[in-house]
């Protein structure tokens, strides 16, 4: 596994991540005020909850995962070393939280589906969030969104206009942040096909039919999806799908085929 001692987040951050973060931070007072709120009202309760309700990975607990995780941490030179937790959940997912006490959480559903190399890929992706400082920004944004909503109620709806703009900026940044973390996974694994295959497995992998998954077909699917942009109406549909469109939630992640194309 390659190692990058002293690597800066700017060495691999996607330009779209940087641009979207700049837009999000443009809201006055967003950064300074929210940081202290996160420290005392968000990060610590999350850590206490994980300690009480999940399994903390260590040398004597999920030792194989612990060794894999340590290698990924060393590869990206992530400091301080995050704590890894496994939580009982069939949903194929993992996430990163915290800054003072950064944590990576992996669902059992993900561990049961993926191979060791694919699990390393996910670990590296989540460590990318920690390395890039995404965890704090996500928590700050959630707090700011809630605050803007409350202000809207107290100011006869005026603050809701602020809230709407902030929500759009937040979700746009969250999606672009994933592109940086896919790059982090690529740095650690040094295997583009492995990262792409992991995306495919998370998107629609099946243990029973794993032998029938075809990465070349998934690549073609990504190309076909991108070619839909030649039709203006399809571009509108894509925008609506990402941004709620009145019938669903805004998406926090780009579609897997989009991520594959960006990678």
Spans of features found by a protein language model:
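Hydrophobic or amphipathic, alpha-helical segments that drive membrane association/targeting
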Residues: 1-100, 168-170, 206-207, 227, ...
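Active-site-proximal gating segments in proteases and membrane effectors
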Residues: 29, 86-97, 166, 186-263
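Short pre-active-site segment immediately N-terminal to the catalytic Zn-binding motif
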Residues: 56-60, 105-121, 169-175
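Divalent metal-coordination and catalytic microenvironments
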Residues: 69, 106, 125, 181, ...
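An active-site-proximal "capping" alpha-helix that borders the catalytic cofactor pocket
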Residues: 69-74, 174-196
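Short alpha-helix carrying the canonical HExxH Zn2+-binding catalytic motif
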Residues: 111, 115-132, 136-137
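Catalytic Zn2+-binding segment of zinc metalloproteases
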Residues: 127-146, 153, 192
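Post-HExxH zinc-binding segment in Zn-dependent metallohydrolases
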Residues: 143-178, 185-188
